[in-house]
Structures are given as structure tokens and as C-alpha cells.
Amino acid sequence: MKANHIRILLLVTIAIMFISLMGKWEQTFPADNTKQQTSATQNNSHYDNADSSTNTDVTTTDAKSSLAKETNFSKYDNAKSITINTGVFKDVKVSLLDGAIISASLKDYSISLDDKTPMSLLTDKSGSEYIAKSTIVVNKQPISVNFEDQGIKIENGKQILTLTGSADGLQITRTYTFDDTKYNISVSQNIKNTTSAPVNVIVDDSFARDFDPAGDSFSLLNAHSYTFTGVAYSTAKDSFRKESFKDISKTNGQPTVINSDGQGWVAFLQHYFVSAWIPQSTNAKIYYKNLNGDVFEAGAFTGATIAPNQSENISSILYTGPIIKANLVDLAPNLEKTLDYGMLSFFSEIIFWVMNHIHSLVGNWGLAIILVTCLIKLIFYPLSAKSYRSMAKMRMLQPRIKRLQETYKDDRQALGKKMMELYKEEKVNPLSGCLPMLIQIPIFISLYWVLLESVELRQAPFIFWIHDLSMKDPYFVLPVLMGLSMFLQQKLSPAPADPMQAKVMMFLPVIFTFLFASFPSGLVLYWLTNNLISISQQWIITRHYQATHKK
């Protein structure tokens, strides 16, 4: 295959690879539960396997009708609530009905560039409800608790809200501890059995969300549609698994229960943000399910048998906030994996680490992208220089190649043989021009996921009209400049021998301009910067080579 054929294939492969394959892999290839579900059994409630003696890894149940009533969002409408504000949270509302957290806004993250209102990660807004709750279950039946507010006290700089309530012979004291600078909330409860008989109690920490999976569709020209929305969890056997809401909606209401076999966690994931329950016990079980229609629930429940006049302490940590590795790594094992950069995460993490350090110095993510690009080009300069010298030599051979083409225009086999002899004689590798492009593929894909998944770049401005590097260029200036740079780069490269190939190559900048028009502007900025540096390097090396090899 000719060198120009290879170049064309590589260019097209880049687009197809990260758009059609990498871009969609999270939605197309969700976690496969086949291996675990070999031990699945059918039951009438996801609490049926709550005993600590149960060893089932995964249990699917068929209790849709009985579970649908567990989350009735409207029941919180008329209940009183306590509002708490911290350095990172605005208007955290804790309902006195069951102690559910029905609203929490993030002070440092606005809804959009145009709407600076803090975004509500948890919300009781009708039609888009998303709440965190801790349900008391007695003898495998959820009970409702009307709590009383015992006030908020400040201790070591932390706000501690205490609620007390009683139901079905249980006295419950629940505390919520808020750290002023953190997104994690400690939820602890003391449950006392005031009856004359032992009571089997379960504390079910869960999320419930009204979400339409049909609206979470993939679009080739919308980069943000590649992101994941659904459930994630971690156990001793599975360090990190995900299940999209779209896939869960196809389970016909059958909850899936997983034995954590140690400290695990369960979370609702969305673009840039995560809400996670982290039980502090080692015998918790994790579950997720589609309650009915567009309502999804996931949680972790811990069981205990409380003797008469005895009490049990059960604690959990609730995290609801941005997906920032530094915030998550110490909360629970593998929680930082919710920052999922895909198959090339190793390279992505290195790129982000370097970018983050540069950003701390220059204070602008756009400049950080440019400087990272310069650094990458510097590291790979020896390979690029070798490739450009080979291309310069190929360019100088063009007159001889054209003479061969004219001489053997009716004998393509002989032409191919003579050209290979020429390459061998002049010690030229016609494929070496592809090397810089091959090097760019993993870097390009890695940076793509960094720009798409890193919340630090959400609404990050660059200059002038670029107000958000994670979104497309609103005026398409960068994609057009990138297309022009590709066209200029082609002019510096050896011309294709085949006229048809030359026409195809001429249209590639147009095709890529169209594709890049929908990509995050930060990614286009990287590609444009990379092209401009490559053009400069190639021009200098070509001029120098031609000056020193004139005959």
C-alpha cells in the first residue's frame, strides 16, 4: 500500500476511532454482569437476602409492584425541613419526614455561563427529583419516621444537625455532620429497641432519581452525549462497575443486589458530578433498580438484630459533589475511579496532572493546553524530526518519481518495482511520514477524555469568545483555523502520486473542520496548536535539508 493511502487511512481512523468507538464505549459496552449472575436467585424483595449469613454475590428479585411505593416524592412536599448552608453547599434541605436530604446546591458550580445560580445536584423539583434518603426497615418492611429537630451545634468547625424520632418500638437518633469545606456528609444513627423482643433492623441508604433514559441518547456530533449517566458501585470482588439507567430500565423492575464482602459504595453518576453512599460497615449489600417508569433507585443497606433495651450504631458517609480525584481518593477504596477517562486513562491522568500543575502557574486552562502541547512536541521532537527529514527527502525525489510515472504509466507493476528500488537506493522510508500521526492518536484520545470528563475545565474560559473550553467554539473560529492549518501542512508534504488521492487529500481538511466543529474547543485548540508547531518544525527542517542537499 502506498504511503499516501496510509496517510488517508490514518486520518480517517483518528476520526472514526475516537468518535465511533472511544466516544461511545461507555454507553455501548456497559459493565458485564454475566459472570456474577450465575449465582442469581429470584425473591419477592431485595431485603430477603439481608441476613449476614447469606453469601449470594448477586440476587435479582421480581418485586417491582411492592418497591414502587418506596419512593413517593410528593410525600415530602408538605413536610417540614431544616436548611443548612456551608462553604460548599447552598440550601441543603433535610426533611423531617424520614430525614431525607431533598435538596443540595453547589456554590462553586453554576447552572451555566448565562445562569450563575448554583446548580442543584439534589433537588425536589417536580419532574426531576433526585434525593438521598436513609430508610429504617423493620422485619423487611420500610417504616416512616417523623423526626423532631434537636437543633444544630458547631463543633470543631463542623455543623452537626441532630434529629430524633420513634416508630414501631424503636427510638432513633440521627446526626448529620457537615464539614464547611467538604462535599461529604457523615450520617450516623443510634437505634434503640424499646420492645421486649429482638428486632431485625435494616438501615437502607439510597438515592432515588426521576430520570428519562430516552433523553440520554448518543449523537455523533454532540461530544457530551458520550458521557455516562447511571449507577456505579464498588465491592471487594469488583473494584469498579457501571450500569447505565438505560440498561437498568430494561430489567422489568427486577432489583439487583450485590454482596459487598467488605467496605463498598454505590453511586449515581452523571457528567462531572457524583452522589455516593459509603456505608461504614463491612456487611452492607448494594442494590439498584428501576422502580417504575423513569424513577431509579440505588443504595446500600446494613442489617442488624437488636436485643430488647439494646441499641445499635450504624454510620455512613454521603458524598454529593464534583468528581475531583483529590476529594474522593481518601473517602473509600476505588471511589476515585468515578473519574473515568476510558481505556487510555493512564495517559489521561498523566496529561491532566501536567496540565493541572501548569494551570496552577499560568491561571488559564487554555494556556495550559497550549503549553502541554508544546511540551509533548518537545518530547517527541527527535521522532518528528526524523520523519520530517524523510518527507523532505521524498519531496526532493518528486521529479524522479514523476519521470518514473511517465515512463511506466502503462505498467503499474513495473512502476511499483522501480519506485521501491528508488526508495531503497536513496534510503527513504515512504511510511515514515505517518509516524507523528501515529504518536498523536493515543495522546489525542487521552486529551479528549480529559477535556470531556474533568470538571475543572467545565465553564473554563480561554480568551475573547472562548468562554468554556469544554464546549464547542460558538463561532467555529478554531475549527476553521484548524482546517486551514491542515491544508497548509499538506502543502509542505510530498504530493500524492495518484491524482485521485490528491483530490481526496484536498477534501480532508474540509471533512475534519466539519467534525471538529462539534468538539470541545479545548481539544480543537490542542490540535490547532499541534498543527502550527508541526508546520514550523517541518518548514525549518525541510528548508535546512534542501539547503544542505542541493546538487
Swiss-Prot record:
Residues 33-59 are annotated as: Disordered. Gene3D superfamilies: 2.70.98.90. One of its GO terms (cellular component) is plasma membrane. CDD domains: 5TM_YidC_Alb3 (cd20070), EcYidC-like_peri (cd19961). Residues 33-47 have a biased composition (Polar residues). Keywords: Cell inner membrane, Cell membrane, Chaperone, Membrane, Protein transport, Transmembrane, Transmembrane helix, Transport. It is a multi-pass membrane protein. It is found in: Cell inner membrane. GO terms for biological process: protein insertion into membrane; protein transport. One of its GO terms (molecular function) is membrane insertase activity. Residues 50-59 have a biased composition (Low complexity). The chain crosses the membrane at residues 3-23, 361-381, 431-451, 504-524. Disulfide bonds: none annotated. Required for the insertion and/or proper folding and/or complex formation of integral membrane proteins into the membrane. Involved in integration of membrane proteins that insert both dependently and independently of the Sec translocase complex, as well as at least some lipoproteins. Aids folding of multispanning membrane proteins. Interacts with the Sec translocase complex via SecD. Specifically interacts with transmembrane segments of nascent integral membrane proteins during membrane integration. HAMAP family: YidC_type1. Belongs to the OXA1/ALB3/YidC family. Type 1 subfamily. This is Membrane protein insertase YidC. It comes from Francisella tularensis subsp. tularensis (strain SCHU S4 / Schu 4).
